[in-house]
Amino acid sequence: MSIKEQSLMTPYLQFDRSQWAALRDSVPMTLTEDEIAQLKGINEDLSLEEVAEIYLPLSRLLNFYISSNLRRQAVLEQFLGTNGQRIPYIISIAGSVAVGKSTTARVLQALLSRWPEHRRVELITTDGFLHPNQVLKERGLMKKKGFPESYDMHRLVKFVSDLKSGVPNVTAPVYSHLIYDVIPEGDKTVAQPDILILEGLNVLQSGMDYPHDPHHVLVSDFVDFSIYVDAPEELLQTWYINRFLKFREGAFTDPDSYFHNYAKLSKEEAVNTATSLWKEINWLNLKQNILPTRERASLIMTKSANHAVEQVRLRK
């Protein structure tokens, strides 16, 4: 079926890997193998080929969208007779735990910052906007961490709203996976970047998720382009367990780690623990809150084994 025929049946254009890779055109590779190695996650094999075939075409597409947005801003400034404020273009990246959102975000940050039109690219994760553990404990939400109710949504929305309003310096809280908590007094200042990449579980939620409050303002109201990183559930579970096992031998061995006790588990005990955590928390959150937002994304990247993207769907 041709792309034109597909477009009559779905709001998305669908590309297999080779079709998408061809859209790279003549965009040069601007990352070295060493730089790519530093960008990949603990559980991923990010290759030069993956960057060339998947992320370079995506960076080219985003550059077109961002350039168009800048032209639109210039038209508005000309109409109003004003000198425009620096308003960042916001890209959100959503998807399940362990799917590789952070790697996607880091690769895009590296690639987009090398385009001459927009050098300043900031990356913020929504983990920092989780309520502190003390608040979650008081509300009985420690086992709901990552669910919508565990976030300080008012602060997150104010953060993106201030950026889109041209506020010169906006602060974002920072999360530590070592202590499994928001770092007290650890705020990061974001000063009018050209692009902000916002990565997190909950960035695609819309008013449909809050039927009791039809006037609810959400992060998605301020996002210019949204990406959903997708994969089959059985792969997500496998990746989550494998990541847990690697943390057990790495980060969990740090005495300061919140999960230090997990480092003492046998491999069988660790697999059982990770499986329980996946089924009781992360899978539940995926089914209830994350997966239902997938079709709201501007672009859906679907992964197969080894975190290789096999299909891309782009909203018309």
From Swiss-Prot:
UniProt keyword terms in alphabetical order: ATP-binding, Coenzyme A biosynthesis, Cytoplasm, Kinase, Nucleotide-binding, Transferase
Its cellular-component GO annotations read: cytoplasm
Pathway(s) it belongs to: Cofactor biosynthesis; coenzyme A biosynthesis; CoA from (R)-pantothenate: step 1/5
- Residues reported to bind ATP: G95, S96, V97, A98, V99, G100, K101, S102
Biological process GO terms, please? coenzyme A biosynthetic process
InterPro entries recorded: P-loop_NTPase, PanK, PRK/URK
User: Which reaction does this enzyme catalyse, per its entry?
Assistant: (R)-pantothenate + ATP = (R)-4'-phosphopantothenate + ADP + H(+)
> What one GO molecular function would you report for this record?
ATP binding
The protein's name: Pantothenate kinase
Native organism is Salmonella gallinarum (strain 287/91 / NCTC 13346)
